[in-house]
Amino acid sequence: MKHIVKHIHFVGIGGVGMSGIAEVLVNLGYQVSGSDLTSNAITDRLAALGARIAIGHAAENIEGANAVVVSTAVRSDNPEVLAARHRRIPIVPRAVMLAELMRLKQGIAIAGTHGKTTTTSLVASVLAAGGLDPTFVIGGRLISAGANARLGTGDFIVAEADESDASFLNLFPVIEVITNIDADHMDTYGHDFARLKQAFIEFTHRLPFYGIAVLCVDDPNVKEILPFVSKPIIRYGFAPDAQVRAVNVKAHDGKMHFTAMREDAAPIDIVLNLPGEHNVQNALAAIAIATELEVKDADIQRALADFNGVGRRFQRYGEVPVVSEGKASGAYTLVDDYGHHPVEMAATVAAARGAFPGRRLVLAFQPHRFTRTRDCFEDFVKVLSTVDALVLTEVYSAGESPIVAADGRALARALRVAGKVEPVFVDTVDEVPDALSAVVRDGDVVITMGAGSIGGVPGRLAQETKV
């Protein structure tokens, strides 16, 4: 074909969603270029793989491209988008490009408001342990692979399905997982929860007649859509009607021990190298898929026991010195987490309590988006009130305009009125290390949490407190 696509350009290539697709395309032999406002470890990795990276957005960056990939975060007046439109170069939404990758293999798409990244990583790890060598595209760095994407030689591609902009409706996988359905990104759905649930129903309708929907029946909203799912279903969770069900669940030494009861297979004893009952649910989804694909029980057990986690999902940085007057006076345990919705945060706090019983829990939290802070304000107050000490920053806007009474200071005031925790408020994440040093004690567990720039803080804490 004269117009065959050889060169694909990514606008915003340094993001986790875009970079994973770019890496797979590089490994498939395509010429890949991309731009972003700043360089980071992701862009450095892609450059080392052979992608051409430009820092800053400019029309000349798309020179020679046959297609330009954009995410919903890219503005329509971006100079590269304008240049592509002027030159009649196809502008391809990220989800459409992911759908094209899925057409090359059998797709396994992981959807849900919470837990997508961890569940996708668990599924990919279990299939890899079973010798299926899957391709994966994950919204976080799989620590064992050192990357958020990999091109495998097997028949399957495992990827996250993003409901935040309804782009998951572009995908046509053969296996789907829905972990849960919660009120988030409601602007996309006109603040109508029924529309959000309908989108998930439509997502299941993308399955072929031989496809399977793997659904967490512990979630009441997932349970409500069951009658509208027309394809075969595997139910998982703690619920009595789950076909893949966890029993005898115990937390020990930061790990979860349980037995997975399976409707069409023998029970299997699991040691999961992650804390928290929510991660037991995530592991059950992986067990359900692995069982369906005839992965051996020993391989399932090994993959879950050896799972090293995902970057910024309860990522442990180890012991960090408590420094006083230039001298170490004990140490605290540092954990970093991407949680930014009250439901996710509550699960992480519960996991920390289970993993570190009896220890004081200190949270440094950066709220993400003014709209989410407004929509979930009371739930934020409730979950933030459950920690022992709190450092709270201003909201990371993610491009949104401020909303009155939905900022960090408003949250701090509401927390003081609630009276269960006295927040230390700081305007920027740059102030977090000093604020933490004033409240942290020997033996504490410190969690840095949020989806914004606070992700850079734990590395600083680990470095700056060396003595």
Curated annotation (Swiss-Prot):
Q: List the disulfide bonds.
A: none
Pfam families, A to Z: Mur_ligase, Mur_ligase_C, Mur_ligase_M
Q: In which pathway does it act?
A: Cell wall biogenesis; peptidoglycan biosynthesis
**UniProt GO molecular function:** ATP binding; UDP-N-acetylmuramate-L-alanine ligase activity
* Family according to the record: Belongs to the MurCDEF family.
Q: Which reaction does it catalyse?
A: UDP-N-acetyl-alpha-D-muramate + L-alanine + ATP = UDP-N-acetyl-alpha-D-muramoyl-L-alanine + ADP + phosphate + H(+)
Provide the binding site for ATP: 112-118
Classify the source by domain of life: Bacteria
The EC number of this protein is 6.3.2.8
The top EC class, named as a word, is ligase
GO terms classed as biological process: cell division; cell wall organization; peptidoglycan biosynthetic process; regulation of cell shape
User: Per its database record, what is this protein's job?
Assistant: Cell wall formation.
Q: What is this protein called?
A: UDP-N-acetylmuramate--L-alanine ligase
Q: Which InterPro entries match?
A: Mur-like_cat_sf (IPR036565), Mur_ligase_C (IPR004101), Mur_ligase_C_dom_sf (IPR036615), Mur_ligase_cen (IPR013221), Mur_ligase_N (IPR000713), MurCDEF_pg_biosynth (IPR050061), UDP-N-AcMur_Ala_ligase_MurC (IPR005758)
Instruction: Provide a GO CC annotation, any one.
Output: cytoplasm
**Record key words, sorted:** ATP-binding, Cell cycle, Cell division, Cell shape, Cell wall biogenesis/degradation, Cytoplasm, Ligase, Nucleotide-binding, Peptidoglycan synthesis
Q: Where in the cell is it found?
A: Cytoplasm
Which residue positions does the secretion signal occupy?
none
Q: From what organism does this protein derive? A: Paraburkholderia phytofirmans (strain DSM 17436 / LMG 22146 / PsJN)
NCBIfam families under this entry? murC (TIGR01082)
